Amino acid sequence: MTMPPLTLYLAAPRGFCAGVDRAIKIVEMALEKWGAPVYVRHEIVHNKFVVDRLRDMGAVFVEELDEAPTDRPVIFSAHGVPKAIPAEAERRNMVYVDATCPLVSKVHLEAERHHENGLQMIMIGHAGHPETVGTMGQLPEGEVLLVETVEDVAGLEVRDPERLAYITQTTLSIDDTAAIVAALRERFPAIAIPRKEDICYATTNRQGAVKAIAGRIDALLVIGAPNSSNSKRLVEVGRAAGCRVAQLVQRATDIDWEALQGATSVGVAAGASAPEVLVDEVIAAFRARFDTTVKAVETVKERVEFKVPRILREPAETP
């Protein structure tokens, strides 16, 4: 039986960013150093495949610190945590490792610096996302105002329009954020802007990679978790760039093949917490149904690496 021809365009960069890679290594090295169980507050990264693999190795995922015993190490997720969390871990004499992405930590430090200079903070982000909760939790309650949309800007009530600064979640849509920033600067001309864009290199690169293939494809598949902010943004970027069909899938088994009927070219992208093995799985699923040609489209090479915390490079002690 002859299979219909189809071209798969693989967007690159895709998949693991340096912060995700570091966070996963932290859990693996902690298990190697201290043995199982090692506790992790919140999913280390938003990907079920990754979390399940680490759970099989002996990681125990909890949502709150009080679910972890005080005599076992605990790791904080890549998204960052409010200041109160490590303070509470220290109060309980717990061994903890902070896997917060260094680029998220940069935003934390930026918020603290502005606060120390007497500026009120405005954060562009998604309410309830762990990164937003963690960043807002670096400052006293009420010191950070959250905006999610351009419309939110009009309703902001600030202490002093001359004493403001803004920061952003690192995984936002570049285009949407630019519109919100423009609205902030129009309403508050004196607002202090970040020294460097808070949206991280990996988010920027992955959105750019989707835009680069959007004009060549009939449909887009983004491999990522439904709670992954950067993966959901890739779907939105694809739709905004003209992709009639744009699906977010965790595994190849999630693909809606009916929606792909008639497609002769499909783009594949992957969020920053999706491992390459899941991309391979999707390619295999297409090869089983189509005479598939695979073309990689790389927009930039990524060479960023982050070191793991010193505590994991030191000899083990009983926690």
UniProtKB/Swiss-Prot annotation:
Dimethylallyl diphosphate binds at H46, H79, H129, S228, S229, N230, S273. The keyword Metal-binding applies. Gene3D superfamilies: 3.40.50.11270, 4-hydroxy-3-methylbut-2-enyl diphosphate reductase, catalytic domain. Isopentenyl diphosphate binds at H46, H79, H129, S228, S229, N230, S273. Keywords: 4Fe-4S, Iron, Iron-sulfur, Isoprene biosynthesis, Metal-binding, Oxidoreductase. Binds 1 [4Fe-4S] cluster per subunit. Pathway: Isoprenoid biosynthesis; dimethylallyl diphosphate biosynthesis; dimethylallyl diphosphate from (2E)-4-hydroxy-3-methylbutenyl diphosphate: step 1/1; Isoprenoid biosynthesis; isopentenyl diphosphate biosynthesis via DXP pathway; isopentenyl diphosphate from 1-deoxy-D-xylulose 5-phosphate: step 6/6. (2E)-4-hydroxy-3-methylbut-2-enyl diphosphate binds at H46, H79, H129, T170, S228, S229, N230, S273. One of its GO terms (biological process) is isopentenyl diphosphate biosynthetic process, methylerythritol 4-phosphate pathway. One of its GO terms (molecular function) is 4-hydroxy-3-methylbut-2-enyl diphosphate reductase activity. Belongs to the IspH family. This is 4-hydroxy-3-methylbut-2-enyl diphosphate reductase. It comes from Cereibacter sphaeroides (strain ATCC 17029 / ATH 2.4.9) (Rhodobacter sphaeroides). The gene is ispH.
